[in-house]
Amino acid sequence: MDIPAKKFGFFTASAMVVGIVIGSGVFKSAGDVINASGGNLTVALLAWFIGGLIIMISTYAFSIVALKNTKASGIIDYVEDYFGAKMAYMVGWFVQFVYYPVLVGILSWLAGDVTQILFGLDNAIWPLTILYFIGIYALNLISPRIAGKTQVSTMVIKLIPLVMIAGAGLVVGLFNGNTLTALSERATNVTAGTGAGLAAAVAVTAFAYDGWILALSITQELKDAKKILPKALFFGSAFIVAVYMLFFLGLSGVVSNNEAIVNAGSLDTSVIAAERLFGVFFGNVVSVMILISVLGTLNGLTMGAVRGMYQIAVRGHGPATRHFTDLAKNDAPVKGGLLSVAVSVFWLGVWYGNFQGWWGGFIDTSVLSIVFLYIAYILVYVDIVKNFDELPSWKRYGVPILATIAALYLIYGAFTSAPLMFVYFAGIVFVILGIGLLLYGPTQSALDTGKKN
């Protein structure tokens, strides 16, 4: 087996953390966090800080595992190494049938939302959603190479609107007094209900902070992984937290707490801020950058989604492994990708039902799909405590225990924000996992039979 060259240093590793995590989540979550905080900007800022602290603790805990097994490249590998193939299969099944398809659908909707605003369209968000949904899957199935190049090109663009709105908004807000007003006056149109509070707001930030685990995939390619990886994860995460909090304060300089809540769950708050700060033309330029950021995140998630079933099947477990390990001439796992399309349509339907009042409440699948993945993270933390006896006590016990508490706090916050919707979502997930468990079975994988993979 070929071993990748040791070619990446501290800066590249840190930049990868920033590039993967920063995306559309922070633009969408602005109003959501204020709403979940009960309209209190100070509580919302604290939520952003605590949410960032959670990913800093989580990334450090995972760096411990990554340095022990540099051949592994993600949560499924880590779980398989210490909890066996079946548990890893179940985690992979969750990622393929819940995590990826949920987020692909929602990101398609967000792209439709910002496009509708940019062009001043009415009632176009769902047709645009479908257009983006079909287009991004088609790109990844027909031309995966172009999809990969697209992902790299959008990384830098993601930072530009964040920095511009943060800087200009802070200056304007301090001069006009809006920032101080936002910090001192609670919003009056909160819709979060009895679940509003710090824990619920922290859970909402999980959507904006998601993706950090993917940065561990380059561990074996770092020049001095033991020194570089923990530092890169820490400083990269700290940079993200600082940018997010400054961006959030920048928004408060031109968008009131009440306005942010009215536009909760969409990108409208960020677009409004851009127009007020830079005028219609330059505001639209910033909005285009936000759209590019959304599409970059959507493309990255879709790249994972179309390969998810292949990653399950190639390990030799689950249904029709030979079927799902077949690759097209362009090396795209088309059959697994088409299954991903079908599953994403289902979850997009759940998201659509939120706006039609089908569920009697809002099932925030964007947050819940991420929060539920932290259950799998806890398995990794348990493994550190049980098996990493060569570590000093603070690493073997302190770090994983703190990371476990952080994960449980996120889960608690998601539950308290909307208990009934949490239960509905959990019910759907358990059914999906139950189906996966019924279909689990050791079969010969493509690797075992020498098929192309």
Please place each PLM-identified region on the residue numbering:
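Helix-loop-helix junctions that connect adjacent transmembrane segments
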Residues: 2-6, 120-124, 153-287, 419-421
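Membrane-interface "cap" regions at the ends of multi-pass membrane proteins
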Residues: 1-42, 55-56, 60, 71, ...
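Hydrophobic transmembrane alpha-helices that form the core helical bundles
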Residues: 57-133, 137-141, 146, 291-308, ...
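TM-loop-TM module centered on a large, flexible mid-protein loop between adjacent transmembrane helices
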Residues: 77-80, 84, 117, 237-299, ...
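Membrane-interface loop-to-helix entry segments
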Residues: 112, 125-178, 233-238, 372-375, ...
